[in-house]
Amino acid sequence: MRPTATPPPIVLLRAVTHAYGSRKALDNVDLALHPRELTFLVGPSGAGKTTLLKLINRETRPTRGQVWVAGIGAHELKASQVAGLRRRVGVVFQDYKLLPRLTALENVAFGLQVSDLSVSNEEAQDRARDALEAVGIGDRTASFPHQLSGGQQQRVAVARAVVAQPPVLIADEPTGNLDQATAWDLMDLFEDIAAWGTAVLVATHNIEIVTRLQRRVVTLVNGRLMRDQPAGHAGRMAWLATS
């Protein structure tokens, strides 16, 4: 039986450097992310993790190098072209960023319509309902954010990020406001999303989760990619993430 071939990368960074003035937030970083893969991005504060996520979502451009997302050269895009790339990248934040006057269903549907103006209200609500069901809170569609627990709010945020079925999902410290049990539930959800075929990249300081899950781990230190460890080899990296 032949081994399963690794699919081509959906995200590719080539010799990427990003500087804020004279300080290099990222320094000559090469990175490839593949479909069906959950990858953790770790490193001390100021290592460049958030900058790397912003480059993938084209919130900023590299000073040097190339950033490719779903075949699109993010580094080449003009401001008027960015929306097309962002439809291919779902984003989950630490603080949820839900609109307080909208229900869970409306928050997810609104996110879809913002990214794709051609979607009708009816289709947006149908797809939002499906997304909420997929992340395990299909029974809370009519709830407002203040009526939901932190874990439930984060699931709404994940549903909003994946409702357009992007090939890439990035998450910036998504467990920062969650207790450990709820954080584990969220990681289970990210593993499910990766199994759907999505490339999932999670920036985190939660070393317990990283070491126990034993997925691929990319370590940044002072803007440099210091280690890229495949699944099953995460236990030896904890000191780098906390130094």
What are these regions (language model features)?
Residues 144-148, 152-154:
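Conserved ABC ATPase signature
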Residues 57:
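Helix-to-loop junction immediately C-terminal to a conserved catalytic motif
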Residues 102-111:
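Short coil-to-helix segment of the ABC ATPase nucleotide-binding domain corresponding to the Q-loop/switch region
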Residues 65-73:
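Conserved ABC transporter NBD signature motif
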Residues 169-172:
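Catalytic Walker B motif of ABC-type/P-loop ATPase nucleotide-binding domains
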